[in-house]
Regions:
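Extended, H/D-rich, highly charged conserved domains that either
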Residues: 1, 40-159
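N-terminal accessory alpha/beta regions
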Residues: 1-22
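A broad, structural surface signal
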Residues: 7, 33-36, 53, 57-64, ...
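Short secondary-structure junctions and interdomain/linker hinges
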Residues: 12, 16, 38-45, 121, ...
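Generic amphipathic alpha-helical segments used as scaffolds and interaction surfaces in large
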Residues: 18, 22, 46-50, 98-101, ...
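A conditional alpha-helix N-cap/helix-loop micro-motif detector
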Residues: 24-31, 169-174
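A short acidic-Thr-Gly-centered motif at the start of a beta-strand
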Residues: 31-45, 101-104, 178-186
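Glycine-rich anion-binding loop/nest that anchors nucleotide
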Residues: 51-54, 112-118, 151-196
Length: 196
């Protein structure tokens, strides 16, 4: 069931969060170094895109530790909502003393989770990201917030599941999978693959 699957994802996160401090710090430092190696770029090149099929939040945890901003399709802060807009939003700043020449903010990457996430939840017609701490024991207590209307682990947006043939060709997955070929065909887009 989705409840068992979400529990196994949370167990893997908890294993990292509760590991011996030296081992955890060493592993997270490797992750931070990896993420920052391609989050920085020259001002004329497009943002890097990170695509992952993973349901856990290890990349998000590493990005948070590194101070890396991840641009995904969620808008908002308290309970972000998924937007299918393809607007190419970015983060810029104006250097002191220079007007009219905004520059790209360093430490920003585009981020797409192709198969959903343990903290994505279907609420009526919307997809929300809930505030689920990294390494939490169970998702259920975090689904009891106002506005979630009797949500349970069965409403988590984790794929593939038994209904994947139908659901992955619908919102939000069709939008997420469109982002992949769009990023692949842009210039200066390196590929890093792992696993098999």
């Amino acid at each position: 069931t989705l409840e068992d699957f979400s529990k196994s994802i949370l167990d893997s996160e908890a294993g990292i969060a509760r590991a011996d401090e030296d081992k955890r710090e060493q592993a997270l430092n490797v992750l931070v170094t990896f993420l920052m190696s391609f989050a920085s770029r020259t001002g004329v090149r497009a943002r890097r895109n990170i695509f992952t099929p993973n349901y856990d939040r290890l990349i998000e945890a590493g990005a948070e530790l590194a101070g890396l901003h991840l641009l995904d399709r969620f808008l908002g802060n308290l309970m972000p909502i998924f937007r299918s807009s393809r607007l190419d939003l970015d983060m810029h700043y104006n250097p002191p003393g220079i007007r009219g020449e905004p520059r790209y903010l360093e430490g920003v990457a585009r981020f797409t989770k192709l198969h959903g996430s343990v903290d994505w939840l279907q609420v009526d017609r919307d997809i929300r990201r809930v505030g689920l701490p990294f390494g939490a024991d169970d998702v259920a207590p975090y689904l009891q917030a106002p506005g979630l209307k009797g949500a349970s682990a069965h409403k988590l947006m984790i794929y593939p599941n038994a209904a994947k043939d139908r659901e992955t060709s619908d919102h939000p997955y069709v939008e997420l999978f469109r982002d992949l070929p769009a990023a692949v065909f842009r210039p200066h887009g390196p590929w890093i693959t792992y696993g098999g």
